[in-house]
A protein has these predicted regions:
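Structural and coupling elements of P-loop NTPases
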Residues: 1-289
Length: 289
C-alpha cells in the first residue's frame, strides 16, 4: 500500500462490506476521512487555481432532473475549487457573463437534503437550476477570468432512433430528451430535414439506452420506441463545408446535427471513415467535442 500512488490515482484501496447488512460501513467511512487527500489545485484555462485562493470558484460537473418527482426540480451539482462559499452570495456565471444569486444551496445525503450555509474547496453543493446551467460551467465570485476546463465527453459507440407514437405526448418527449441530454446521460442528434418528432441517440453503453427508456416512461409519462441503428462511430466535422450533401461518403454513412447544430457523420466501420477522408480533400474529423 502506497499513499503516494493513491494520491496520483494509480492505486485504489478496496474495502469489503455490505451496506444492506451494515457490515464494514463505519470502518470504511472512518478510513475514508483519514485517507482522502486535501483538495488539489484545479486546472483552469489561465493556469492552476489554488484551493486556498480567497476568490470563490467552482464548476458544474453534474445536472440531474426530477430528483424530487413531486416538484419536477432540476439540480446542478457544483464542486467548490477555491475560496469560501456562503449561502445567498452573488457570483458570476462566467460562460453567460451574468451575476446570479445562490439563494437555496443544498447538500445531499442519500434521500435527505439540508440547506448548506457554508462550503469550502472540495465540497459539493446542489443548486436549483431553472435551465441556466450546463455541465462544465464555471462560477466565480470576483474573477471573470477563471474558466475551468470542461468535463471530457466520450464518443458514443451505440446508436438508436428514438421516437414517440402518441402525438399528444410529443411535448413531454421533447422536454425529456432535452433535459436528459443536458445531464450528459446521452447525446442527441437530429437528422437533416427531419423534424423533432424523433431523434438519433448516441450512448457509450447499452445501459444508457435502457436508463433513457425507463426515465422517459417514469418521469415524463412517455412510451418511447427505441430502435437500434448499425452505426459504431461518430465524427464531428471541424473543417469548413458549405453543403454536407457535396461530401463523398459511403452509402451507409449518415449526416446529422448535434444539439449545437454542428455537422456529425455516423459511420458503421473504420473503413468508411478512412474512405471519407481519402475522398474528400481537406476534410477534418474529430471523435468528440
Amino acid at each position: 500500500f502506497d499513499m503516494e500512488l493513491v494520491n496520483k490515482g494509480e492505486l485504489t484501496p478496496i474495502y469489503f462490506g455490505s451496506a444492506m447488512n451494515n457490515f464494514g460501513v463505519e470502518t470504511f467511512l472512518h478510513s475514508f476521512l483519514e485517507l482522502a487527500p486535501y483538495p488539489s489545485p484545479k486546472q483552469s484555462k489561465n493556469g492552476l487555481v489554488d484551493p486556498m485562493d480567497n476568490n470563490f470558484s467552482g464548476f458544474v460537473f453534474k445536472i440531474q432532473a426530477n430528483m424530487d418527482p413531486a416538484h419536477r426540480d432540476r439540480v446542478a451539482f457544483v464542486r467548490i475549487c477555491s475560496g469560501q462559499f456562503e449561502k445567498g452570495m452573488s457570483v458570476y456565471h462566467v460562460q453567460e457573463g451574468k451575476k446570479i444569486k445562490l439563494a437555496q444551496p443544498q447538500q445531499f445525503m442519500a434521500q435527505d437534503r439540508t440547506i448548506m450555509e457554508k462550503g469550502y474547496a472540495g465540497d459539493i453543493i446542489g443548486l436549483f437550476d431553472p435551465g441556466i446551467f450546463s455541465i462544465g460551467d464555471t462560477l466565480s465570485e470576483n474573477d471573470m477570468n477563471v474558466v475551468y476546463e470542461g468535463i471530457p465527453s466520450f464518443s458514443p459507440e451505440i446508436f438508436a432512433r428514438v421516437h414517440v407514437s402518441n402525438s399528444m405526448k410529443r411535448k413531454q418527449f421533447q422536454k425529456g430528451m432535452a433535459q436528459l441530454a443536458q445531464e450528459g446521460a446521452i447525446q442527441i442528434f437530429k437528422e437533416i430535414n427531419i423534424g423533432i418528432e424523433e431523434y438519433v441517440v448516441g450512448a457509450v453503453g447499452v445501459l444508457q439506452l435502457e436508463v433513457l427508456e425507463y426515465r422517459l416512461k417514469n418521469e415524463y409519462g412517455v412510451e418511447p420506441t427505441v430502435n437500434r441503428m448499425p452505426y459504431r462511430f461518430a465524427r464531428w466535422i471541424t473543417s469548413k463545408i458549405d453543403d454536407p450533401d457535396e461530401l463523398k461518403l459511403t452509402s451507409t454513412t449518415k449526416t446529422v446535427h448535434d444539439s449545437d447544430d454542428r455537422y456529425v457523420l455516423l459511420f458503421e466501420n473504420q473503413w468508411s471513415i478512412d474512405w471519407a477522408l481519402e475522398n474528400n480533400k481537406g476534410l477534418e474529423l474529430i471523435d468528440h467535442m
